[in-house]
Every structure is written in C-alpha cells, then in structure tokens.
Amino acid sequence: MNVRLKRARELAGYAVQLTKDEGLPTMLKRGAGFVKRRCFGKRARYLPAKKVLEAQRAEMAGKTAADCGLPTISILTPLYNTPEKYLQEFLDSFVNQTAPNGQLCLADASDAEHADVKRIVEEYQAKYQRIVYKKIENKGIAANTNAAAELAAGEYLALADHDDILAPHAMYTMGKAILQLRAQGEPDGFLYSDEALFSKSIQRPMVAHFKPDYAPDYLLCCNYICHLAVFQKALWDEIGGERPECDGSQDHDLFLRLAEKTGGAAHVPQVLYYWRVHAGSTSGGTDAKPYVAAAAKKALADHLARTGCTGTVEDGLFPSTYRVKWDIVGDPKVSILIPNKDHTDDLEKCLHSIWTKTSWENFEVIVIENNSTDPATFTYYKEARQRYDGLQVVNYPQKGFNFSGINNFGRQYASGDYLLLLNNDVEVRNADWLTELLRQCAHPGGAAICGAELLYPDETLQHAGVVTGLGGYAGHSHKYRKAGGSGYMFRAATVQDFSAVTGACLLVKTSVWDEVGGLDEAFAVAFNDVDFCLRVRDAGYRIAWTPYAQLTHYESKSRGGDEKDPVKARRFAAEQQRLYAVHGKANILHDPYYNPNLTMDREDFSESNGLRGLKEGRITVQWRG
C-alpha cells in the first residue's frame, strides 16, 4: 500500500477512535492542533536552538572519542532491506552528531536484491571510521541486534532502528548525563530519553512522547521507555543480550531484564530520537505487526517468573498495553473509613453499592460521624446498622471539619490489614473494585498505596492519579476527559506509578499508615492526601493507580473553590504554603512521574509553552529505583 495512503488511513482511524473516546469537540480541537503544528508550527520545535548545537560542536572541535571526555556509546542497528533514503538519513544523523563519542555498529541481513544497502554503508565507512559493518544471515531482529553488539567497542550500548533518525545532540547529551550521574553518586547503568514521531522530516515532527521518570508499574503495562535507551555493555553481556524468543517485543523484554539488574533507570527529558512513522513500522501501531502482543506477554510472564512473583498476564484496555493480574497473598482484611455529616442520601447510595456490588468479602465499614445536625441522620444510622451487617458508626469528638483528624480517629477502630479512605459521595461501579485495589498492593514488592478511577456522573474523569505541581500545587491527571479513552501515552488506561492519589478513594497498608503517622492534621481540608502520599513515597514506598477499580464520584464539577469564602480562602492559602514548607517548593513542582516538558497549567498532558528546557538543551537526569 502507498505509504501516504497508509498514513491517511491511520490518521482517519485515529480520528474515529478519538471521537468515540472523547467526543467530536475534542477530536476537532486535536485535529486543528495537528494541522496547525504540521502546516504552521514552529520548525524543529523539539531541537535545541542553533546556538546551543553550535556551542556543543565548538566544545568538541578537534576531539576524538578517546579524548572528548565522554563515555563511548556503541549504537546497535540491524539492517534489513533498508530503503536508500531512510538509510542515508539515518547514517547522516549519526555522522552529524555534535560529539564524537558514538560508534555505529551495523549488522546487515539484507537479501541479495538489496545489495545497495552494503554499497551505501561502505561509502560512509570510507569517510567515517566510527562506523563498523558486518554482513550476516538474517536470524530475526533480536539475533541480528546481538550480532551488531559483537562489533561494539563502547562502554555503553544504545539501540536504534535502521529507518529512524538520531537527534544531533543525542550522543553529547547522553554522555553528559552519564557523567552527571557519576558525579551525583547515582547508578549509571541504564538511561533513557524522550522521543518524537515524524513522517518526512524531523523539522516537522508529529508528536513527542514526553515520558515520566522510571515507573516500574507503567513499564509492566507498556514499553514506554522505547527510544533512546542507553545501558552499560557489561550489563548487556551479563544478561545475554536480546532474546530471539521475544522477537517483536525484544526491547521491552530487554528493558525488563536490565531493570531487574539495575533496580531502576535514569531519565533524560530531552528528545534525542525521532521515530519514523510509515507503513509497517511499530510506530504506526501494532496492527502493522500483530505478533508484538504475543511476544510482549511472554516477556512479562518471564519477568514474573524470574522475580519470583505470581500472577497472570493479559491484554490491556488498548492495543500495545498489557495487564498483570497479581495474585493476592492471603486474605487481607480491609477497613473502609467513611467520614459523614448528614447527607444520608449520599451515604446510603455509597453503603448500598459496597454491600451489593463488592466481590471481595473480607472488609469492614466504619462510618465516622462528624457533628451531624439533622436528627434524621441518627435515625438513619440505627437503620443502617440493622441493614448492613457489621457496620460501625463512631462519633468524632472534635468540632469543625478536619478530614485528617476524622480519618485518624477512625483508624483507632479499624482492625484491617489495609485502610481504605472513602468519601461518602462515591458509588461503586464494578464488583471487583476492591480486589483490583488490593491486587496492586497485596503481593511481594507491591505498592503501599493504590488509588481508583473516579468518574463524574456524566462519564468524564474526575480522578486518574494526582500530579504534583499542576496549578502550582497539585491536580488530577486527565480530569474532565471522557471515560474510556487511552489518555496521553495510555496513561488514562494503564496501571501506573504516581506521586499521589486522591483521598476520596485511597487504599493503604495499615502498617505503612502507622509508620508515617497517618494524616497530618495541619492539613484540615486541602492537600492532606497529597502530603500523606509524599511522606509515604519519601519513606521508600510506591503509590499506584489502577483503571480497573471504578467508582462514580458525585462531587459537583461546577463546585466553587474556597476562594469565595474569606475564612476558607485564608485556610486554603495556609495549607498551600504548608505543602511547600513541608516538602519543598522545588519538589512539589517537579513530579518525577510527570515530564517537565508538559504544561503545569492544565490537567490534559499538553506540551508546555516554549519548551524552554528543550530549546536550551538543558541536561538534567534523574535516577529512580
């Protein structure tokens, strides 16, 4: 099929799916943005400014890989019947790097009808000694990549496809990032960068993949690392390179095995790789290569076996995504804490949904009565205790509303292995909601906290994880987007790591709650959940979010903020400042699971205005385990 026609059909299919997922207005808005970027957008918007690249070249002028001061990175690229134009553009992107610390290792499995591949490479070899080449028998992508690795002389390796393009500062940036990690005393064995998709020219990229820092739960659901990944050759040798039995998802499999050895990875938020979209490429969707899913599930199942974990691997909610259904260890008891003041209609809806829909049987519910004034409320409590077996109602002794204090008080009556903070204005949607929350925590190496997908009654997202720094303090991922969509890089449809989740539905190990001292009562209304999650994260635990636990949250979308009441506004401002004081403003504004190239003004994962970090070629690197 003609490549342009193929691309047109892919875009049409994307538009249809986007309309189904998020509605016609969103599709039209997104489509207009695409046309604007493609036809009128600033050229090379993900590349550093020209003066930055010139400064890098000046710094490295006259130097070789041996004396440039940067670690040598050998790029492994299997060749197979590569179109001449694509091959030349790829080779040009290597030889035009701003630093000389790269080596290009080419293993050519092209058939006899594509002898021009060898001819073209040999022409470049005659000019550039940093290109090494070997003609090989075609044994599949993994084996061919392993053959390329046999040519490598570098301390580090990187993977690049034969039809893609390296950003001009890729080798310089990765080399400097490795030196930064060493200076900081952090592991330097495994790094990855951001990437962008393009069809014709990297001067007109289609979209960037701005990734989070290392996120192990997210990596189990999709290969978000992808390009450009750089890792020590010693690690590659230790794990035996790529596995042919995972052809199609060989890189995903490799990254899982590398992470098992390193315990994490370092992320460089620069676009260092351009992934070409054309007929037959995986960047165009796994429909082009359907064997990818089977290979990915094998890679994940083997990862579970190697790490001693038990569970099953299934397809995810969208193509290219997967789901690990962890086996829950034992029969943990969950204590559900529900603060309540009057509003018995909301509470009844909540309790009824818990008792009639929840498949997990080992739970208790503790309603924490907080200064109700309607006599009918207490009549309701009496009736509810008769209707719902085991329901407890305890009386919070303090006056006023303090969400933290109320839940801390309720903890005293809880006997569960886990606590579930739950608002009284939520309603259970799926029977295995509690099972799915437990699934992320109640297994060896599981998260300490897990949050749920909360939806407004109009089927838009209210909560899909919390991103710190949005709006200056914190915001909800993908808020107001139509439910059922994939979100940015599948982030509204996969189990993943977050810095925080909302206290409207938050499962936490009771032992961890006690370890960090519960909720901070200085956060009476706002940010108590964010503060709690950050303290748990700082104690070395992980926070997860799952789309497989769904509840309706009847919080009003149009509810006004506390700024309308002077007293509440002062309290809210004080809690904002306390969040900065306790955790540091810089830490709040840099959420490791949210890319610095994304906006801080909205909750839609759109690009930030200006992309200053990219234009300045700013080299920052963060290792996470």
Predicted regions and their residues:
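A short, conserved alpha-helix in the catalytic core of glycosyltransferases
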Residues: 235, 245-271, 300, 433-438, ...
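Short beta-strand-to-loop acidic/aromatic patch adjacent to the donor-nucleotide binding site
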Residues: 154-165, 416-429
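Glycine-rich, basic loop-to-helix element that forms the pyrophosphate-binding segment
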Residues: 136-152, 396-414
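C-terminal, non-catalytic tails of nucleotide-sugar-dependent glycosyltransferases
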Residues: 2, 6, 10-68, 289-331, ...
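Active-site donor/metal-binding and catalytic loop motifs
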Residues: 269-286, 316-322, 455, 521, ...
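Conserved donor NDP-sugar-binding/catalytic core segment of glycosyltransferases
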Residues: 169-205, 426-473
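Nucleotide-sugar donor-binding/catalytic module of glycosyltransferases
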Residues: 31, 36-288, 302
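Short, acidic, metal-binding catalytic loop of nucleotide-sugar glycosyltransferases
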Residues: 92-101, 352-362
